Amino acid sequence: VIDLLHMIDLALFYMGYPDPQHVLAQTFNDFIENKGFKGPWGIPDVADGVTNVESAAHGFIRFTTGQVLSYQVSWAEMNKREEVSVTFQGQKAGGMIRRLFNVDGLDETAIDDCELYVQENGRSVNRSIITEPNEDMGRIRAAQNFIHTIEGVEAPLNTPDQALTLMK
């Protein structure tokens, strides 16, 4: 998984970056050369550009902590609506992060969900996590943090150990 790693990264953040124990996954690039297939994604910015990333990935990860994570991410596959989602489960909580597109590939048509599932006082409690929209998807803040980290002003948003866990 190269291009579609973002949902796994987000789920690992919520899970506390546990160490992976087993990974079962499959990537697909069935539609990568078909420029007319569903939506504007995957099209090179220049005429001679290369399209050499996956178009979909599905997988299941078990961690040494006993937590599990399943994911479905794509920008082009045979389905009703494009969906990018990850579900995670542990002993104290579970959750789901999902982006469902009304028009494939167009972020402005997407519906975002982020939910946390817990037990409180013997009752199931489902919480929707609502955040302010961020048009740059955190890119400006991440770049600022990188500079501030080098300057010694801030701690990094992501550590090298977290990046290594993500790549495993």
Where are these regions (language model features)?
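Rossmann-like dinucleotide-binding domain that binds NAD(P)(H)
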Residues: 1-68, 73-80, 161
